[in-house]
Amino acid sequence: MESNLSGLVPAAGLVPALPPAVTLGLTAAYTTLYALLFFSVYAQLWLVLLYGHKRLSYQTVFLALCLLWAALRTTLFSFYFRDTPRANRLGPLPFWLLYCCPVCLQFFTLTLMNLYFAQVVFKAKVKRRPEMSRGLLAVRGAFVGASLLFLLVNVLCAVLSHRRRAQPWALLLVRVLVSDSLFVICALSLAACLCLVARRAPSTSIYLEAKGTSVCQAAAMGGAMVLLYASRACYNLTALALAPQSRLDTFDYDWYNVSDQADLVNDLGNKGYLVFGLILFVWELLPTTLLVGFFRVHRPPQDLSTSHILNGQVFASRSYFFDRAGHCEDEGCSWEHSRGESTRCQDQAATTTVSTPPHRRDPPPSPTEYPGPSPPHPRPLCQVCLPLLAQDPGGRGYPLLWPAPCCSCHSELVPSP
């Protein structure tokens, strides 16, 4: 029984169960894939600084988690060029960082996606129902608690397994039940959030369009993540239920230790290392690569015609998918576009003392001035009303209206006579 359970704890002398030439090629391929993802995410973080995006946001936290995950996986596979015995005799902290921490990081990225889409849904509701803000705080607390529970279980199981202070079967059972159950729950909650986003498309699509995507694309990406994470968890739970306690080496495809797969030579022949790499590719590298590509950093638009004027300030439509989900909801504004000719913004904080300034327009040209059938510059059709208030320096208490440029015809708004 001890030989069958040897895969649960790193054992000295275990090597990938493939010929050296094949093992070297697979190791080089695995290392190259993870290294490419690492440099891709690293470049995305530099683009955040280059384009002047918000430095601390959902997007940057997500990219930082993916960067750390790719770095740990690249370091792990680099051991298998020449230092396989050394990789199997690591201390508790390096062992946990290389073998267990990447799984925790993937779970954190899944909870981060849940948090963002839940925020999109709640921000769409909070304008009409302010009490929904308490529900958002409860959702955030639940996902933070799930992340801490996942981290605590994996750390304790790794430490106890390394020191052999508990039965391997009991540790494996607890770790798989807790970790994979949390994966399934978070995958289902992500599916529910995406359904709510799709159902409330008129009020939630603005957040997704600010990133350059659509509700359909976000739903497709979220559905793929749900299938990948849920299938991984269901496979592990099913395999654990079917595996007897004396034959754990037929299971343990749970990304816990590369040497576990080297112990599968009796069941898989010389394909243990290959199977392990394929499992990592399907259930780790593929979903992370899709997420990084979907949430990549975009260049802000340079065309000022896409800007909006809100309360006398110009805001370009370069909102970031992870920065402020409720930006437009908080400002309380709505945009109306009529055949590309005018942009209209109504200020929701108007007071009873505010009067709408008239638009100073040039007098219409006389027929003798423009002999043609129509004047070369027709009269502007401006629908923007932007009262800019200031305190009367004379102390009379009357608001003053300062001149402001019009966003559609570039003329001037002047106070009433």
Curated annotation (Swiss-Prot):
Polar residues bias spans: 345-354
Spans through the membrane: 32-52, 61-81, 90-110, 141-161, 176-196, 219-241, 275-295
Keywords from the named record: Autophagy, Glycoprotein, Lysosome, Membrane, Transmembrane, Transmembrane helix
Biased composition (Pro residues): 364-375
Stretches the record annotates as Disordered: 344-375
Function: Lysosomal integral membrane protein that may regulate MTORC1 complex translocation to lysosomes. May play a role in autophagy.
Family membership noted in the UniProt record: Belongs to the GPR137 family.
Protein name: Integral membrane protein GPR137
Source organism of the structure: Homo sapiens (Human)
